């Protein structure tokens, strides 16, 4: 058995433990009773340490050196590249830091659920201080090894090849045209007569509708399921994908589009190359590409007028109000409104929420600001970008997201990168597919075949730039995103 084959076998062993960690994490968020938190945190930390020790076994260094010298096919070279990247990412961190970070993150995240509801910044800040400190330690270790800034080192975990210099350029450009576009869209919509949700929408009916929409989007229910959690997410593994949403019985909008969004993530996972399962090359390319798939479903498909016709038809099976008329649904789902909450934000204001978080987490990881500065900075940027004050309103301000509670610094840019990639994929798809006609037909297979051929089946065999260029003929071009927004909202 050559060194490459030994590395693949080892990778699959690590993936099996990762599988368990994913399912246990889903259980913690979706069904675990609150009294189980402490013991669960300890168990998960132990499992993470075991995975880390497997990924950093001393003999792996020799295996990688030997494999580099072996004659490998192009696909095997890509597999080796991705296995080595995972190994290097893990090998940089001491086991003690991995364990401490896992414990601090679990403790902070679990307490945050109640603290956020109570607007308890003081209580949250005590736990979060440790998460930030450990994240900064991790960032510095990664930065020293890679010769980058601490934030760029964290960004590299989620977005290989992306830098804050590139993001600064992209986001600075967005900031030149987004505020006026938001204001123009709001002004244009003033005459819209929208019937907003105003009634009782039982959670079980919302779930039944959501399941029908997932079926329309060809979710594979033999390899996945829908549940409920505080924060919607997609977890699990490609053969057992777990998506969640949350229900508010006074409205239906967030649960429905939340399901469409998470189904996009799930279809990507379910469509990853099965022959590469258990290896890093068989995983999603980056979080930006992952978000491009959820946002392709939610924004490019989900807000398409032909798709909204389907939503109206399916909703009539469960609800009878005029708010579910197709013209009204279209207005609801393209309504532009400046709001506090990122996950409830419309397509147009969403990038402002992401840019705000990016700028704060970049400066926090780089040591430019302290964690105690965050509420004030958040308020300043919300006022500057969306004209809203969050002073004293931590629940709807800096405490609203789950990401920072466990130290996931460097993730937020993925959302707007994803929206940009999604717009570019749609522009490319429209060159060969009558997208509106396909959606209208109710059989969306041609759309999913394109996504499978160009994105899902590639796993991480290509770099992000290679993947995007092969699929669309060019690397990331944010002009497609701007053109899409102008076309829809002006």
What is each model feature region?
Residues 1-160, 486-490:
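A well-structured
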Residues 101-252:
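Contiguous, non-catalytic segments that form substrate-binding/exosite surfaces or channel walls
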Residues 254-273, 291-295:
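Active-site recognition of the HExxH zinc-binding catalytic motif
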């Amino acid at each position: 058995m050559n060194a490459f084959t030994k590395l693949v076998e080892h990778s699959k062993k690590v993936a099996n433990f990762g599988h368990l960690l994913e399912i246990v994490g889903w259980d913690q968020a979706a069904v675990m009773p609150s009294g189980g938190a402490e013991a669960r945190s300890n168990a998960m930390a132990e499992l993470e340490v075991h995975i880390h020790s497997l990924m950093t076994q001393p003999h792996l260094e020799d295996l990688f050196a030997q494999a580099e010298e072996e004659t490998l096919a192009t696909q095997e070279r890509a597999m080796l590249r991705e296995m080595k990247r995972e190994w290097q990412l893990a090998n940089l961190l001491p086991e003690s830091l991995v364990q401490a970070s896992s414990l601090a993150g679990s403790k902070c995240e679990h307490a945050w659920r109640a603290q956020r509801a109570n607007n308890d910044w003081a209580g949250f800040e005590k736990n979060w201080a440790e998460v930030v400190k450990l994240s900064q330690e991790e960032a510095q270790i990664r930065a020293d090894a890679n010769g980058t800034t601490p934030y760029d080192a964290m960004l590299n975990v989620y977005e290989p090849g992306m830098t804050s210099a590139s993001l600064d350029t992209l986001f600075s450009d967005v900031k030149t045209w987004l505020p006026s576009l938001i204001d123009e869209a709001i002004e244009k919509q003033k005459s819209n007569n929208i019937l907003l949700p105003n009634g009782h929408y039982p959670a079980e009916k919302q779930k039944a509708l959501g399941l029908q929409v997932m079926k329309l989007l060809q979710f594979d229910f033999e390899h996945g399921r829908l549940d409920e959690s505080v924060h919607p997410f997609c977890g699990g593994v490609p053969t057992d994908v777990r998506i969640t949403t949350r229900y508010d019985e006074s409205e239906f909008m967030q649960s429905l589009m939340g399901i469409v969004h998470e189904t996009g993530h799930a279809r990507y996972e379910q469509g990853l190359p099965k022959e590469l399962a258990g290896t890093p090359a068989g995983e999603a390319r980056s979080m930006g590409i992952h978000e491009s798939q959820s946002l392709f479903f939610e924004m490019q498909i989900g807000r398409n007028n032909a798709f909204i016709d389907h939503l109206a038809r399916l909703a009539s099976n469960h609800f009878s109000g005029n708010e579910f008329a197709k013209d009204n649904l279209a207005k609801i789902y393209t309504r532009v409104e400046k709001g506090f909450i990122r996950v409830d934000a419309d397509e147009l204001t969403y990038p402002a929420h992401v840019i705000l978080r990016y700028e704060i987490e970049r400066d926090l990881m780089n040591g430019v600001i302290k964690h105690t500065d965050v509420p004030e900075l958040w308020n300043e940027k919300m006022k500057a970008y969306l004209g809203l004050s969050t002073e004293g309103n931590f629940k709807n301000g800096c405490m609203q997201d789950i990401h920072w509670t466990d130290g996931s610094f460097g993730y937020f840019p993925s959302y707007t990168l994803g929206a940009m990639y999604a717009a570019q994929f749609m522009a490319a798809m429209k060159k060969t597919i009558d997208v509106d006609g396909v959606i209208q037909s109710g059989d969306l297979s041609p759309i999913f075949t394109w996504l499978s051929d160009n994105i899902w089946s590639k796993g991480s065999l290509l770099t992000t730039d290679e993947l995007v260029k092969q699929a669309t003929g060019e690397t990331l071009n944010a002009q497609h995103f701007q053109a899409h927004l102008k076309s829809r909202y002006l």
